[in-house]
Amino acid sequence: DNAPLWDEFNPYLYDASVKLVSGKSTSLTTETFGLRDIRHEGNKLVMNEKPIFLRGTLECCIFPLTGTPPTDEASWEKLYASAREYGMNHLRFHSWCPPEAAFNVADEIGFYVQVELPVWSVTFGKDSATVEFLRAEAKRISKEYGNHPSFCFWGIGNELQYDFNILASMLGEMKAADDRHLYTTTSFTFEKGHGDWPENQDDFFVTQWTKKGWVRGQGVFNQELPSFDKDFRASIDGMEVPLVTHEVGQYSVYPDLTEIPKYTGTLMPLNFMAVKEDLEKKGLIDKAPEYLQASGKLAAILYKEEIEHALKTPGISGFQLLDLHDFPGQGTALVGLLNAFWESKGILTGEEFREFCAPVVPLLRFPKAVYTNNETFEA
């Protein structure tokens, strides 16, 4: 009853060894595991009887030097360290499952992981062979990685559309086979009649909006004057499971041309090279650092407001940024304050970012961004 439990603040691990002796033969196996109780109480995520808030970003299998994810723990230690430096406690593996090393490190440092099957499809269920492969893959993932305490959340895939009856059947099978995780049908969907409220079997709900309104700044910042006394509570009123905001941000930063020499492996930065060539032709190459800083500072302000909006909202259980680092997997998406190598672009330090993204964040509500000297500031 008094055994230490695993969480982000106390990632306590145990080793269990089993030895089988038969005549002159001996077999020994050791399993590392953690004890934790994760569930939801209404719209709150609860870990070991305490509410948790996910401060997350995506990992979209972005490894520019190799094109494949690393299988050594040192590489994952570096990646997780960068995420934690910027206040994160959660990674969503977007439409893929990482290798064993990623789970081992997450276990050791206390990171909450969301895994997905390798699918991002607008025709889910149309091809029966694909569905059967994914069913089998779910069983393999559960068998190989399911006992890791960091493996807290599981979704079938990203923005899935088409046959929600098959999705429901598949999620039911996954939940019945393995109750060590919390499950969601899909990380958001554009399917008509879905995506704005949880599916019946969802333990948590990942979305951009609900049937009552937006839960990320995309539908707010472009429509309203800056204000700091609002939140998304009207949009989640009546929500009965925890809500995590989907792919928050996507604020572009000008290319950091000093990044070009870093690409020494499988990926060539042709987009960066084209921008550099264009600036040189126009005699503007000296302006590139200024463009980076100006666009980056705006992106940082917007990310800050996104995060604080979520933190201010009772009933929101976390956010998943797109992205803390750049996303070169879908054209050019320089949406990160870190580059594709999880390295700083010099826009905002981790210490500065943690001022608004951390386990404890002071928040203030006030109605506008600009005041004159003859006004009284009330908050």
Residue ranges of model-derived segments:
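Substrate-binding/catalytic cleft of secreted carbohydrate-active enzymes
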Residues: 81, 90-339
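Secreted/periplasmic carbohydrate-active enzymes, especially glycoside hydrolases
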Residues: 1-94, 105, 110, 137, ...
